[in-house]
Amino acid sequence: EEGAAVAVELTWTANEWTGSSPAEVSLEKDGYKIVVKKNSGSHNPYLKDDEVRAYANATVEVSSDNEFSSIVFALGDTFQYSEITADTGEVGTQAKGDTQVSWSGSSKKVVFTVGEANTYGSNSEKKNGQFRFKSVTIK
């Protein structure tokens, strides 16, 4: 389709991420910026095995100079996976066993918030939520 946006898959290694403090890490790549902030949560964002880990009450901000209409996070380990919400647009239906979290809308910036409890994770005990992702595809 002529004029259609081309999907860009962002992958990374842990050393590509930078941080202004332990409570905030960011990645700038291919015209996009991802910022993960601890906010009121108990744990700082963490990178392990090139997977980003955002914990309960953290935010994941995706931004660009150009509008985008779709974001898909490829999930890592879903042990304590929680509900993910967005400040604009719509997050796709989430369920236990998911391998991705999707968003649709029209924006230059979206802020995702990590839920408090492990609503959809494989851990049956009620624990603090996590959002672990290993790549992001944006268009």
Task: Give, region by region, the residue ranges found by the protein language model.
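Short, surface-exposed tryptophan/glycine-enriched loops
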Residues: 99-109
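Short beta-strands within extracellular/lumenal beta-sheet-rich domains
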Residues: 43-67, 97-101, 132-133
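Extracellular beta-strand elements of beta-rich domains used
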Residues: 71, 134-136
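Short beta-strand-plus-loop segments that form exposed binding edges in beta-rich domains
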Residues: 112-131
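Extended, solvent-exposed, non-transmembrane regions
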Residues: 23, 28-53
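Extracellular carbohydrate-recognition regions
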Residues: 1-31
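Short, surface-exposed beta-strand/strand-loop-strand elements in extracellular ectodomains
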Residues: 74-99
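Short proline/glycine-enriched turn/loop motifs at strand-loop junctions of beta-rich domains
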Residues: 65-68, 75-81, 107
